[in-house]
Amino acid sequence: CIRDRHNLTGLEFAYGIPGTVGGAIYMNAGAYDGEIKNVITSANSVRADGTVHTTEANKMALSYRSSCYQKNGEVITSGVFRLEAGAYDDIQDKMVELMGRRRSKQPLEYPSAGSTFKRPEGQFAGKLIEDCGLRGYTVGGAQVSEKHCGFVINKDQATASDVMNLMNQVSCLLYTSPSPRDR
């Protein structure tokens, strides 16, 4: 943990987000007013022809849950981040605060890939899913979380196919719902 060895601050928002550095860059992971785009300076990736490429942050087209890597097919192998020196206790306090918020709102008692659905601008995916009556909706072993509808959890030995089918069904149901909300 960079906090323990170097007292570096800037990635506290990512504490508790499941995944890898490459995945975080790929989707511009973020939570609680922090995003990868705020701290990354560059990333290395491998192209389809096997060449290694370095991309500077300003060329990554980072936006809400999006990056250039979603279109170019490159595999991210590492990232360079701009972090600042901080006080250990302040960093620890922020991480504890954010994890407390996660525990109170997110279904951490079940395996999941974290927040599953991309939020429409100005709205919350979990609220839209709840409004469509999909809390607890299940496909195979995958379920829309009862605790937070923005999460798909592995309730009972879900397969990848269960999770993908559930995500697709929820998306289709949201777009065909007679809800008065703009889609």
Where are the predicted features?
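Conserved small/polar residues in nucleotide/adenosyl-binding loops
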Residues: 1-4, 175-182
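Short, well-ordered alpha-helical segments in soluble proteins
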Residues: 3, 21, 25, 29, ...
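N-terminal glycine-rich flavin-associated loop
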Residues: 3-8, 35-54
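Anion-binding (especially nucleotide phosphate/pyrophosphate-binding) glycine-rich loop
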Residues: 3-21
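Gly/Ser/Thr-rich beta-alpha loop segments that engage phosphate groups in nucleotides
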Residues: 16-25, 32, 116, 152
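Active-site glycine-rich loop that binds ribose-phosphate moieties when present
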Residues: 24-31, 38-41, 54-66
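Short Gly/Pro-enriched turn/cap motifs at secondary-structure boundaries
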Residues: 33-34, 107
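Phosphate/pyrophosphate- and phosphate-bearing ligand-binding catalytic cores of soluble enzymes
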Residues: 46-165, 172-173, 177
